[in-house]
Amino acid sequence: MNQHVKVTFDFTNYNYGTYDLAVPAYLPIKNLIALVLDSLDISIFDVNTQIKVMTKGQLLVENDRLIDYQIADGDILKLL
């Protein structure tokens, strides 16, 4: 089983762009967001720990993991 998925992170709600990334599928959303922000050197204060999966219409929150919601390569994850 692949431990990473290739997704697009959309930070346009925070005046940042979109980024194509390979991210770990097994981390809780709150840890994943922190990891991605740190890796991209993006500073967002009061970051929301909710992600909308634009390609599937799902909402993921703090303790949800990508692997549990069948998030796959090519999905678009928008930080709310």
Swiss-Prot record:
The gene is esaB. It comes from Staphylococcus aureus (strain Newman). Belongs to the EsaB family. It is found in: Cytoplasm. Seems to regulate secreted factors that contribute to the establishment of persistent infections in the host. Negative regulator of EsxC. Not necessary for the production and secretion of EsxA or EsxB. This is Type VII secretion system accessory factor EsaB. It comes from the Bacteria. GO terms for cellular component: cytoplasm. Keywords: Cytoplasm, Virulence. Transmembrane segments: none annotated. InterPro entries: EsaB (IPR014921), Ubiquitin-like_domsf (IPR029071), YukD-like (IPR024962). Disruption phenotype: Deletion mutants display only a small defect in acute infection, but remarkably are unable to promote persistent abscesses during animal infection.
